[in-house]
Amino acid sequence: MNIDIVSMAWAALMVVFTFSLSLVIWGRSGL
């Protein structure tokens, strides 16, 4: 099985970006 480091890095980056973005939205909406 070949592990694609670049794909894993992009996946992790998108997860972190989406998570932090949702936290910002939650913070602004007061939830």
From Swiss-Prot:
Source domain of life is Eukaryota
- Molecular-function GO term, any one: electron transporter, transferring electrons within cytochrome b6/f complex of photosystem II activity
- Please give the name of this protein: Cytochrome b6-f complex subunit 8
- Keywords on this record? Electron transport, Membrane, Photosynthesis, Plastid, Transmembrane, Transmembrane helix, Transport
Gene of origin? petN
Family per similarity comment: Belongs to the PetN family.
Report the GO terms under cellular component.
Answer: cytochrome b6f complex; plastid membrane; thylakoid membrane
Q: Which cysteines are cross-linked by disulfides? A: none
Please give the function described in this protein's UniProt entry: Component of the cytochrome b6-f complex, which mediates electron transfer between photosystem II (PSII) and photosystem I (PSI), cyclic electron flow around PSI, and state transitions.
Look up and give the membrane topology term: Single-pass membrane protein
What Pfam families does this protein map onto?
PetN
Q: Name one GO biological process term.
A: photosynthesis
What does the annotation say about its assembly with partners? The 4 large subunits of the cytochrome b6-f complex are cytochrome b6, subunit IV (17 kDa polypeptide, PetD), cytochrome f and the Rieske protein, while the 4 small subunits are PetG, PetL, PetM and PetN. The complex functions as a dimer.
Regions crossing the membrane = 5-25
Q: Which HAMAP family match?
A: Cytb6_f_PetN
Q: Signal peptide: which range, if any?
A: none
Where found? Plastid membrane
